[in-house]
C-alpha cells in the first residue's frame, strides 16, 4: 500500500509513525523550514525530522497551488492514499484526484462540529464533555468532506487543551490505520456531514486570552483550560500581567465586584466572578516560571480585596 503523508506539527508525528509501521510511505510533504528561537535559525518541522530518520523523501512546497512541479512529483509516486494530518495547506482539486483510493484527513473533532484550525481548544472553551478524532474524505472545502470513522474521548472538568491534544495525537494514528484497512476492504460507507450541526473553530489569538471577570466562573475556567498551553488566559494584578494556567470552580456566590480577590491560601486564590467563584491554582508573572499559588505565596503576596482586571 503506497502512502504519501502530509503533515507538519508534533500532532502529526504519531500518525506518520503509524503509517511507516503499517504501510509503504513513499513521500512526506511538510511545511518549509522556519526561523525559530532567538537566533532565528531555520528549524525543521517535527514531521520532517521523523521522515528523515526513516529515510523517506521529503517535499516542502510553499504552496501546492503555485508550484505545479510538486503536483507532478505526487502523480509520479502514484499513491494509493494521501494522508493529511495538520499539514497547513488546503489541497487543490488536482491533488485530491491523484490517489487510487482517496485523500484522507484526520481532524481533531467530532465532525461536523468544530471545523477549522483550533477544534480541541474551542471544544474545551465551550464546555463540551466529549471530543475526539474524525477521519474524512477530503474535498475542496474546509473540513467539509464525508466522514469515515470517529473515536470519542471524554473531557473531564480539569482537562486542558494540551492534555486533550496529547490524547488525540496518540490515538489518531490507530484510527488512520483502521480507516485505510477498512476502506480497502470495502467496510466503510462514507457519511455526509450535516451542515446544520456544524460550528467553526477559528484560530486562537492573544486578544481572546484576557479574562472578563463579569462572566461566570465556569466560563472563565473553561477559557483557562482551553487556552493552556497557548496563548494562556491572563488578567492584571498590581499592573502586571498574571497568566493563569489552572483553576477550579466553587459552587458558591459572592456579592463582591467581579475580579475581587476574596481569599488567598495554599489551595489557591478565590476570585469573585459574575456568577460563582473561581479558585486560581497556578499562575505566572512576566519573566518568571509558572508556579502553583501555594509556591508563589511563600515569598510573595496577593492582597485580599484587590481587584483583578
From Swiss-Prot:
Which EC class, in a word? transferase
Residues that bind (6S)-5,6,7,8-tetrahydrofolate, according to the entry? 109-112
State the EC number(s).
Answer: 2.1.2.9
Q: Which SUPFAM superfamilies match?
A: FMT C-terminal domain-like (SSF50486), Formyltransferase (SSF53328)
What InterPro entries does this protein map onto? Fmt (IPR005794), Formyl_trans_C (IPR005793), Formyl_trans_C_sf (IPR037022), Formyl_transf_N (IPR002376), Formyl_transf_N_sf (IPR036477), Formyl_transferase-like_C_sf (IPR011034), GART_AS (IPR001555), Met-tRNA-FMT_C (IPR044135)
Q: Which UniProt keywords apply?
A: Protein biosynthesis, Transferase
Alphabetized GO MF terms: methionyl-tRNA formyltransferase activity
Which reaction(s) does its UniProt entry say it catalyses? Answer: L-methionyl-tRNA(fMet) + (6R)-10-formyltetrahydrofolate = N-formyl-L-methionyl-tRNA(fMet) + (6S)-5,6,7,8-tetrahydrofolate + H(+)
What GO cellular-component annotations does this UniProt entry give?
cytosol
Task: Tell me yes or no: is Transferase among this UniProt entry's keywords.
Answer: yes
Please report a single Pfam family linked to this protein.
Formyl_trans_N
Q: Does the keyword Cell membrane apply?
A: no
- State the PANTHER family in the record: METHIONYL-TRNA FORMYLTRANSFERASE (PTHR11138), METHIONYL-TRNA FORMYLTRANSFERASE, MITOCHONDRIAL (PTHR11138:SF5)
Tell me which family the UniProt entry assigns to this protein. Answer: Belongs to the Fmt family.
Its annotated function is as follows: Attaches a formyl group to the free amino group of methionyl-tRNA(fMet). The formyl group appears to play a dual role in the initiator identity of N-formylmethionyl-tRNA by promoting its recognition by IF2 and preventing the misappropriation of this tRNA by the elongation apparatus.
Q: Which HAMAP family match?
A: Formyl_trans
What protein name applies here? Methionyl-tRNA formyltransferase
In the UniProt record, what gene is named as encoding this protein?
A: fmt
Amino acid at each position: 500500500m503506497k502512502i504519501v503523508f502530509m503533515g507538519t506539527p508534533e500532532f502529526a508525528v504519531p500518525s506518520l509513525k503509524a503509517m511507516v509501521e503499517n504501510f509503504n510511505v513513499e513521500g512526506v510533504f511538510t511545511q518549509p523550514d522556519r526561523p525559530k528561537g532567538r537566533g532565528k535559525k531555520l528549524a525543521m518541522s517535527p514531521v520532517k525530522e521523523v521522515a528523515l530518520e526513516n529515510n523517506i523523501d521529503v517535499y516542502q512546497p510553499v504552496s501546492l497551488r503555485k508550484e505545479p512541479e510538486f503536483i507532478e512529483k505526487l502523480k509520479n509516486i502514484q499513491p494509493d492514499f494521501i494522508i493529511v494530518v495538520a499539514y497547513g495547506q488546503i489541497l487543490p482539486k488536482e491533488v485530491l484526484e491523484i490517489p487510487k483510493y482517496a485523500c484522507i484527513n484526520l481532524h481533531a473533532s467530532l465532525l461536523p462540529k468544530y471545523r477549522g484550525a483550533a477544534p480541541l481548544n474551542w471544544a474545551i472553551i465551550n464546555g463540551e464533555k466529549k471530543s475526539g478524532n474524525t477521519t474524512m474524505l477530503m474535498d475542496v472545502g474546509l473540513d467539509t468532506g464525508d466522514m469515515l470513522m470517529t473515536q470519542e474521548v471524554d473531557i473531564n472538568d480539569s482537562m486542558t487543551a494540551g492534555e486533550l491534544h496529547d490524547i488525540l495525537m496518540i490515538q489518531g494514528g490507530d484510527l488512520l490505520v483502521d480507516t485505510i484497512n477498512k476502506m480497502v476492504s470495502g467496510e466503510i460507507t462514507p457519511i455526509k456531514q450535516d451542515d446544520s450541526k456544524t460550528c467553526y473553530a477559528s484560530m486562537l489569538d492573544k486578544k481572546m486570552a484576557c479574562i472578563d471577570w463579569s462572566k461566570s466562573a465556569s466560563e472563565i475556567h473553561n477559557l483557562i483550560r482551553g487556552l493552556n498551553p497557548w496563548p494562556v488566559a491572563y488578567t492584571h494584578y498590581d499592573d502586571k500581567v498574571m497568566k493563569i494556567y489552572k483553576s477550579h470552580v466553587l459552587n458558591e456566590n459572592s456579592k463582591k465586584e467581579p475580579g475581587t480577590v476574596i481569599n488567598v491560601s495554599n489551595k489557591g486564590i478565590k476570585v469573585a466572578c459574575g456568577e460563582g467563584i473561581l479558585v486560581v491554582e497556578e499562575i505566572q508573572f512576566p519573566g518568571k516560571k509558572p508556579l502553583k499559588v501555594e509556591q508563589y505565596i511563600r515569598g510573595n503576596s496577593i492582597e485580599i480585596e484587590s481587584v483583578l482586571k
